[in-house]
Amino acid sequence: LNREVFDIHEMIKHVAASFEGVCTQKKISIELVFATKHLNVNADKRKIQQVLYNLLDNAIKFSDPDSIITIETTDRGEKVYTAVKDNGIGIPRAALGKIWERFYKSDLSRGKDKKGTGLGLAIVKEAVQAHGENITVVSTEGVGTEFSFSLPKAAG
C-alpha cells in the first residue's frame, strides 16, 4: 500500500463529478452528506479512489432513473466510515454472500445493459481489506443497497 493523508471528502466530490454525464442521462442525482467540512484519512489514494468509483458505478448501474444515490461519511473515533446508498433493485438475499467473488454477477437476466466484468466488488473488498479495514453491505430487493467501509482517520 502507498499510504498518504488525504481529504476523503475531496476525493468523493471528485469521483462523484466523474459520473456527472451518466447521471444527467439517467436523471440520477448524487447527494453528498459529509460529517464535517474536511475529513482526513490515511490510506492508499489510488486504491480508495477505485473503491469509490466501483461502488458508485454499481449504484448508478442498478438504480432506476429519477432516483437519488447518497454518499455519506461518519467520523467515529479512530475510523472514518463512508457509505454509498442507492434505491436500486437491491441484491437477492441468496446472492449476498457471493457478490464479493471474482466474476460473480447477481443475475444476468436482470438487465441486458448491465455491462461489467464481475470484478468490481472483488476489487473493492481486496482494497479495503488490504488496509486492515472492513466493508459491509445491507440490501433489500426492490428497496436498495448500502455499502459501508471504514478507513483509518489521519492523526492530527
Features from the language model and the residues they span:
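Conserved catalytic submotifs in the C-terminal HATPase_c
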Residues: 2-7, 24, 29-39
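Short helix-loop "hinge" at the ATP-lid/N-box region of the Bergerat-fold HATPase_c
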Residues: 59-60
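Short beta-strand/loop element within the Bergerat-fold HATPase_c
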Residues: 66-78
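Acidic ATP/Mg2+-coordinating residue in the GHKL
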Residues: 86
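Short conserved segment of the HATPase_c
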Residues: 91-105
